[in-house]
C-alpha cells in the first residue's frame, strides 16, 4: 500500500439503475475506490439496502430517469448535499423480448424511453456538474449496439441509440474537457438475464450463439472494468475485451444474423410458441409497478 489517493478518492459519482444488478455492483466498486456515491433508482428500499452495504459515504434518490423535472431536482439535491458530480454512469435500463408484431406497444415504448431517453435526461440533468468538475460521463451500451438480434427489437434499437448518443456527446463536450465513454457489454449475470433464460425462445437464441458470445460474466467483473474506465476517462470499454473486434466487422453482421435467423427461427418456433415476455427482471417489474402507482 502506497497511500496514494486514487482518481476517485473524495469525488462524487452518480449511478442510475443502482438498486440491483450491474448498477449496484458499479456503485460498490466506486465506493471501494473512495468515491462518494449518489444512487438513483425506482426502488427506494432496495436502494437503501445497497447504500447500507457500501464502505464509503453514499446517499440514494428514488427517481424515474424519464422524468425531466425529477431528475433535475435530484441533480440539484446531489450538488447541495454531496457536491458537484465528477462522474456519472448512465446504467438504468430495461429489456423485453419476443416477436415485434405481437409486442405490447406501451412496453416496447417504455424500453426505448428508459434506455435512450432516460440516458439523455440523465446527461441533461448532470452536464452542469460535469462542466464544473471537468468530469466524465459513462454511457452503458451493449453488444446489441453493434449487432441487432431478432426478438429483442426494442432493446437493440435503444442500445444502438445510446451508442450514437454517446458519440455525439463526446464530440460536443470535448472542448469543455468533459469526457464521455461508452461501455459495451455482453451477457452480464443479473436478474434480467436470468429472467430472459426462463423464456424458451430467448434461451434458445442465446444457446445458438457462438460459445464465446453466449458466456455470462459476473456483474462484479463487469463493474470493475467499467469503473477502471471511469478512472482512466476511456472513450470506450469492452467486456469481454474481444467485443472490440466486432467493431471491425459490424457492417457484415446484419446479413449474417438475417441468414441464421431465417434458418433457425422456424425450428425454434416449432419447439415453443413465440410470445412477448413483458419487461424482464425484478427491475422491469418494479418499473411497471411504479408506473401503475403513478397512474393510480
Task: Give short role names for the model-derived ranges.
Residues 142:
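Residue(s) in the substrate-gating loop at a strand-loop-helix junction
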Residues 123, 158:
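Active-site helix of classical SDR
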Residues 12, 19-20:
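Conserved glycine-rich cofactor-binding loop
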Residues 99-100, 104-109:
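Substrate-binding pocket helix/loop in short-chain dehydrogenase/reductase
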Residues 63-73, 105:
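The beta1-alpha1 cofactor-binding region of Rossmann-like NAD(H)/NADP(H)-dependent oxidoreductases
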Residues 33-49:
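Conserved glycine-rich Rossmann-like NAD(P)H-binding loop of the short-chain dehydrogenase/reductase
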Residues 175-241:
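SDR active-site lid
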Amino acid at each position: 500500500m502506497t497511500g496514494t489517493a486514487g482518481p476517485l478518492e473524495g469525488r462524487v459519482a452518480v449511478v442510475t439503475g443502482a438498486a440491483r444488478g450491474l448498477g449496484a455492483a458499479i456503485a460498490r466498486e466506486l465506493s471501494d475506490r473512495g468515491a462518494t456515491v449518489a444512487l438513483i433508482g425506482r426502488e427506494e428500499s432496495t436502494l437503501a439496502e445497497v447504500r447500507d452495504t457500501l464502505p464509503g459515504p453514499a446517499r440514494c434518490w428514488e427517481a424515474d430517469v424519464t422524468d425531466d423535472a425529477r431528475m433535475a431536482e435530484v441533480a440539484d439535491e446531489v450538488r447541495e448535499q454531496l457536491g458537484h458530480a465528477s462522474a456519472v454512469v448512465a446504467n438504468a435500463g430495461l429489456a423485453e423480448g419476443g416477436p415485434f408484431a405481437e409486442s405490447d406497444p406501451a412496453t416496447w415504448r417504455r424500453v426505448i424511453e428508459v434506455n435512450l431517453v432516460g440516458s439523455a435526461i440523465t446527461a441533461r440533468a448532470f452536464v452542469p456538474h460535469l462542466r464544473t468538475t471537468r468530469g466524465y460521463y459513462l454511457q452503458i451500451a451493449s453488444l446489441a449496439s453493434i449487432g441487432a438480434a431478432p426478438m429483442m427489437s426494442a432493446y437493440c434499437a435503444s442500445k444502438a441509440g445510446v451508442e450514437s448518443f454517446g458519440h455525439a456527446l463526446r464530440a460536443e463536450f470535448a472542448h469543455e474537457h468533459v469526457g464521455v465513454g461508452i461501455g459495451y457489454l455482453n451477457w452480464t449475470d443479473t436478474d434480467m438475464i436470468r429472467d430472459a433464460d426462463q423464456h424458451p425462445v430467448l434461451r434458445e437464441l442465446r444457446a445458438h450463439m457462438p460459445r464465446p458470445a453466449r458466456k455470462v460474466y459476473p456483474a462484479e467483473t463487469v463493474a470493475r472494468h467499467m469503473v477502471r474506465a471511469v478512472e482512466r476517462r476511456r472513450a470506450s470499454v469492452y467486456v469481454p475485451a474481444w467485443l472490440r473486434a466486432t467493431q471491425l466487422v459490424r457492417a457484415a453482421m446484419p446479413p449474417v444474423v438475417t441468414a441464421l435467423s431465417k434458418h433457425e427461427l422456424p425450428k425454434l418456433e416449432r419447439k415453443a410458441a413465440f410470445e412477448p415476455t413483458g419487461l424482464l427482471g425484478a427491475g422491469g417489474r418494479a418499473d411497471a409497478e411504479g408506473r401503475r402507482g403513478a397512474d393510480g
